[in-house]
Structure formats: structure tokens, C-alpha cells
Amino acid sequence: KGEGAFLNDEPIHVSGAETLSESLVTIGTSPYYHELADWNFKVFKEVFLSCQDIRRLGSAALDMAYVACGRVDAFFEAILQPWDFSAAKLLIEEAGGKVTDFAGKELPVGMPGAVLAGNGKINEELLRILSEK
């Protein structure tokens, strides 16, 4: 911790996107929480209408690694287990980004929860959408 993030011995950094409207956002869903389908798709639509585009890669760890190296600008998922986000959280923070819950608070250690990972510049815009739905 405190030494930066690297890919193939080269330093990586989160993207420089300043606004959600210029951002590419990855989204996550879980096959274990079908009761969240209505909420998920309502939020996905709102984000889709506010950003450049959205993607669904299928792996929270990969989504978050892409945030860390600037390939995408943000990622969110309503419920993730700590083993799905803990390592990637450190990677993003070391690359200059920010990872919180949907209230903008620090993620609880060892507990499942909502995860928003971003470059730090667009997190507030996404939090407004995520918290009002």
C-alpha cells in the first residue's frame, strides 16, 4: 500500500474523465439477487442516458481492474462479496481512484455490500443516481 499500481511493471492510473457524460461505465448484476432486477434496470437506464455507454463484462474484479488502469471510468454493483472487491479496491485506490458504497461511505471490511468504483471525478454524479433510485 502506498506504492502505486502497476501493470507489466508500468504505472497505471484511473481515467481523467471529468464528467459522467464523457464516461464509459461498467455495470454488475448477480445471479443470486433476482429481486434486484427492477432496481438494476431502472438504474442502468438512468446511467446509460447520462454517460457515453455502459458495458457488462461479467466479472467485478475485471471491471474494477479496468477502472484502475483507465480503460473504463467507473463500475458499480448493488451487492458484492468482499472477496469480489477487496483486492481491486486497493488497486483502484493506488491508481488514484475512489471506491465507496452507494452512500459515498467507506466499504465495511469483510462484509458484502454495494460498491461504486470510479476515477474519483465522476463518483459524485453516479452517487446521485444510485442514491435516488
Question: What does each of the following model-derived ranges do?
Answer:
Residues W83:
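Acidic donor-binding loop at a coil-to-helix junction in glycosyltransferase catalytic cores
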Residues G96-M111:
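Acidic, metal-binding active-site segment of PIN/NYN-like and related structure-specific nucleases
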Residues A65-A68, K89-E94:
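Hydrophobic residues within well-ordered alpha-helices
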Residues K1-L62, P112-K133:
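Acidic beta-strand-loop-alpha-helix segment within the catalytic core
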Residues L20, A68-R71, V109-P112:
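A short, glycine/Asx- and small/polar-enriched loop/turn
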Residues A5, A88, A95-G97:
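Small-residue (primarily alanine) positions within well-ordered alpha-helices
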Residues T29, A78-L80, A103-K105:
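Short secondary-structure boundary segments
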Residues C69-A74, G97-K98:
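Alpha-to-beta junction loops
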